[in-house]
Amino acid sequence: MPNILDYNKFCENLEPVTSVKMFKKRFFHAEGLFSEQIFGPLKNYTCQCGTYYGKSKSGGRCKVCNVEIANSNERRKRFAKIILPIPVVNPLMYDLIVSLGGKAIKAPLDNLMKNEKSILYVIGDETFVVHDDEKIPRTATRYEKADAIHVLVKSFSEMMYEDMEDENWKKLVLNIDNFLIREIIVLPPDLRPSTRSGSQQLMDKINRYYIQILTKKEVMQASFLTAIQDKSIYYTFFRNLQKDVKELHEKILEKLAKKEGLIRGNILGKRIDFSGRAVIVPEPSLSLDECVLPYKMVLEIFKLQVAKRIIGLGRFKKLPTALNYINKCIKFNHLGLLDICEETIKGKVCILNRQPSLHRLGMLGFNIKVSQDSVIKVHPLICSPFNADFDGDQMAVYIPLSEETIQEVKDKMFVTKNLISPANEELTTLPSQDIVLGIYYLTSGRFDDDDFNGLEHFNSLLPDEFKTVTYTVDEKKLISILDQVRIDFPDKIVGLLDDIKKTGFYYSTLSGCTLSLDDFLIEDVQKVKDYIYDTGGDIYESLKRSGSNDVIEFLKNNFRYADLIESGARGSWDQARQLCLSRGFVSNFSGEIHDKPIVNNLTDGLTQSEFFDSTYGCRKGLLDTALNTGTSGYLSRKLIFTCANLQLSDSVADCGTKDFLEVKVTDKKKASCFVNRSIKDENQLKIITRENYGDIIGKTIKVRSPIYCKNDKICQTCYGESYKTLNSTFIGIIAAQTLGEKSTQLVLRTFHTSGSAIIKEGADKKDMKQEDIIGDLSAVSSMLHKFKDRKCEDLVHDLFAVYDRNVYHVHYECVVAQLMWVGMKKWRLCSDRNKYKPKFHSIQSVPDQESWMLAMSFSNPRKSILHGIINSGNYSGIMDKILRGEKV
């Protein structure tokens, strides 16, 4: 970022704009706001009069119209200036000195700027702002107008620096000559466009302020001598000019900020060529790293490469005719180029993306195949990382072009390189539904006979050294087996996943599972209903009975598709109860349970009153999904930019900190979230593994944490051994994506809730109120914005309590570590942390501390520009580095 304080140096070599006129004859005026002579040509390498054109003439100037022969992109880069007849106060410097000095400088400064009778007197080291009629000693030095403002600000800044020795005041003292400016920066014309519509000239609002300033400049120059002699006329011109300059700066800041601003809309915005979109369908014959694109899409995306190949084969001589033939093939779906397409895409890769991209697994790389169908075909097991299904979901296709990007996709973005979730190190390509059902049927003995044993066949798929499976394999057990194979035999997991896929589909097809309405009719239903509801009106007891083992056992023995639920392939016992036995109790908007149950089941049908009561509870889920998805997404976005600059060191193994985070481990689920972390055990560091994590249940452990890491980039010991599977050093973004993805999925999942009331196992009557997912989302947002007197341990604990416990504890710690600051420095990096109490910044304000670009585009632009002035050149945020072309 340039040094904003050095205003005069920036304007030093800029061309001046002197004319308020826009046009001269049919061209832009040579000295106006859109001059081709100042800002560059409108057409590439073509001068204004047309005498010179072509790239061969670049660098020179036309001898007739004096326009430089250059690329028209120069009109987005070249600045100019307006020279003012009298100096005015730099609005940015004014805001800065007032924010640092407060009322002590604001009152006298405003007095000198607005009151024409105000005069500055200096006696020794003291300054006084007085009116003409006040008595002042003759020994005092008198200053008026701009000189008075300059002397006041300079003496005040020097005094504050001597008293406080603050670096901010030092920067002001060194750049105090920029407080009064005689030049206004003019933005490049393409950033403030002007177009003609009929007889009207439509232009950006910023241009109107430039025109006002130029007009007042001309008026003042016409009466310059009078303005110098008459103080009231001088102040009238000064106030009007100062007002226009201030409004101009505010408009420029507005143009930078917000979603449509230059930073988010243009600089940080994505512009993607060579892309497409289509509906996805499963293709079991593919390998994990393969996808099939439609023939017409491949022709369109690889149009130039296909054209080059058919020209090389001698079928066409010129590019336009080859492209014309390709366009006809696309229009009429002609297959004459199918073979050439297949040759063209050899060695090419693509990136598939399904929106919403909640985490990095939402964009994965694939090798390309081509088919004549109009859909994208993918491997069935990639649904889990994309959170996709095959009910009409669409995916976008992006084609990397350069050799470096293609290699990066192969090394880091292929599915086989992302089998492990960054959230919890579990397998991402999980089998489900048909595959799970097929494996369940195979291992349950349904297909066994004298010549075939299902368990033996299943064991033959596993590595030879793996422990023999002797039990029926449902979804949980299958995932556990695959996870263990991934850990023990990492080179065999990809082949095993394909074998499991083929076997599961084959045996689920052989099972011939079909559904009929008659299959949901069960005998003796009335006896079970009487058992559930014959409790004298006790709702708690009825709810307890409806989910009891007796009812589930009854369904297992009488429901024809119990295997679907038992295997984990589809459905739940609560859904089966509603279909076959009774809809049960429903809850209202606030989670309170109605005292009147819906006795009928969904197969027999509901009465009118039962149907109304039934729909009453599920409306909340639909409304929550519609209203809160955006809120959750914005929370995720703020989390990303809060944690974007937190990175893992690839060279520092241990920072040597002596501080530990104390955590009470209450149960097995929480203990598993500390796998691969280093804890303090009798003055030594001990690593928690999958084998010994049960030892810490019920204990308060001291764990090495990113919150206390002394290294700028988090050291490997404080983060834990999980860094080996991340394939990335940007642990802050991974943590933010993990929490953001979980919160968004919570909101989306409310769409599927039916309003049916349930109670959790072990809950008492006090816990009967139904779970409020949106309330949890509000709680998270409140935690990350309002901190009161919380300690970091409490904040981590509260976040962990709200979120899904299937997320490693270190991700919560990474987020909290980014919220703790002392001034402009992270608390964890202070040399003596015990001397300072950390100040918690909200996730809205943390980007201000590290990235000027993010602060300008997401926060208050005026406040952010002040941070930018103070820290000019010192920001090291990821976005700032990208814009400067530095390596991140």
What are these language model-derived features?
Residues M1-G740, T744-F787, A801, L866:
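Conserved core architecture of multi-subunit DNA-directed RNA polymerases
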Residues K596, D789-V888:
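Extended, low-charge hydrophobic alpha-helical regions
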